[in-house]
Amino acid sequence: PGQEPEQPSSTVKTLTNAEICAAMTSSDFSYVEYTIESASGVWTVNASQSKENTFLQCRGKKGGYIKTPEFDKDIKSVTIHFTSAKPVYSDNTYCVFPSTWVVPTADAEYPEDGNVGKAVTDGSYSLTIPVDAGNKQVYVSIISKYSYYLDHIDVAF
């Protein structure tokens, strides 16, 4: 009697560094759209596919993004883990967009309009972005024109 009901534990799906590295097959650094097979599902990215990379190299312009698989539960947050091979800068805004988002293709900063979650880097090597309810698949991107380098990504439900 008087015990609190047990809270359901959160579930996390990960795009691992090993899965990212296995998708790095190109001999150049050009940015292209491709898929990454993962135990958590198929991720779609517009990023460099250079086999020189041991991380996911993305950019916040000209169509750059990471798109999660479509999950069967609402996403509560996305945590991006930056590679220790590159510096992480403070004050860069990252947004999560719904699956209906139209990815900008211009060579300019992305607008934040229509985001379902955002967070700003503080220089640490991970950033958790809370996601509004009702999203089972999302895009993740930096708002500035900078490139960013990810070791792995966690999606929590």
What are these regions (language model features)?
Residues 2-38:
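Extracellular carbohydrate-recognition regions
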Residues 51-75, 122-127, 150:
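Short beta-strands within extracellular/lumenal beta-sheet-rich domains
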Residues 61, 81-93, 146-147:
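Extended, low-complexity, turn-rich repeat/linker tracts enriched in Gly/Pro/Ser/Thr and Asp/Glu
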Residues 70-79, 135-137:
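Extended extracellular/luminal ectodomain segments enriched in beta-structured repeat modules
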Residues 86-109:
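Short, surface-exposed beta-strand/strand-loop-strand elements in extracellular ectodomains
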Residues 103-134:
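Extracellular carbohydrate recognition and processing domains
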Residues 139-149:
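Short beta-strand-plus-loop segments that form exposed binding edges in beta-rich domains
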Residues 153-155:
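Extracellular beta-strand elements of beta-rich domains used
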